[in-house]
């Protein structure tokens, strides 16, 4: 196993590159949010209400939304269906969650999303159509969903860079070789 499994391939198919780019962003985001207590996860910068805890919960929602409703039309499930109160609910409500809950929510959503996206790729490939449509009923392709996830992570991994630096000074583009997120005492992924 590679010491840097999040690195995209140097030469590979379009699908391998898209999945590699997504996993690199996921890993970098998770590294930026890793190993913090409640205070660290709720740190804000200036007038912004963004926190690493809010980003963990928001990106868990995005992973579940993309890999259920948009991918297959399957209901998104809990906790997203019954707790939704307002547009920024995932960001705001994260203040009520423990670090363990936030990490488990994100880790679980990513694992589910990977499995669902892998199944869709095995079934129809990158050119397969998904449930999501435009206003005229035109169906989106799986490639679009992967690009949407990459865009979302690109935006929020940049936010996470700034937030984490404000918490404890951690900077850098990639986790150190061999890094794995910890849940309790066991590595994840």
Question: PLM features: residue spans?
Answer:
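Acidic/histidine-rich alpha-helical segments that form the ligand environment
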Residues: 88-129, 141-154
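Short, contiguous alpha-helical
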Residues: 4-8, 15-88, 130-189
């Amino acid at each position: 196993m590679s010491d840097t499994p999040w690195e995209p391939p140097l030469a590979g198919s379009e699908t391998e590159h898209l999945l590699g780019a997504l996993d690199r962003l996921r890993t970098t985001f998770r590294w930026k949010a890793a190993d913090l207590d409640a205070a660290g996860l709720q740190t804000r910068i200036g007038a912004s209400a963004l926190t690493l805890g809010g980003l963990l919960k928001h990106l868990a929602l995005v992973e579940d939304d993309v890999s259920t409703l948009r991918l297959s039309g399957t209901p998104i499930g809990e906790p997203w269906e019954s707790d939704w109160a307002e547009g920024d609910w995932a960001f705001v409500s994260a203040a009520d969650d423990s670090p363990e809950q936030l990490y488990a929510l994100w880790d679980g959503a990513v694992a589910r999303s990977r499995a669902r996206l892998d199944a869709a790729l095995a079934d129809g490939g990158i050119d397969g159509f998904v449930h999501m449509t435009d206003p005229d009923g035109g169906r989106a392709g799986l490639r679009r969903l992967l690009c949407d996830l990459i865009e979302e992570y690109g935006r929020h991994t940049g936010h996470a860079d700034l937030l984490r630096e404000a918490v404890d000074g951690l900077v850098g583009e990639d986790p150190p070789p061999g890094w794995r997120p910890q849940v309790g005492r066991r590595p994840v992924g």
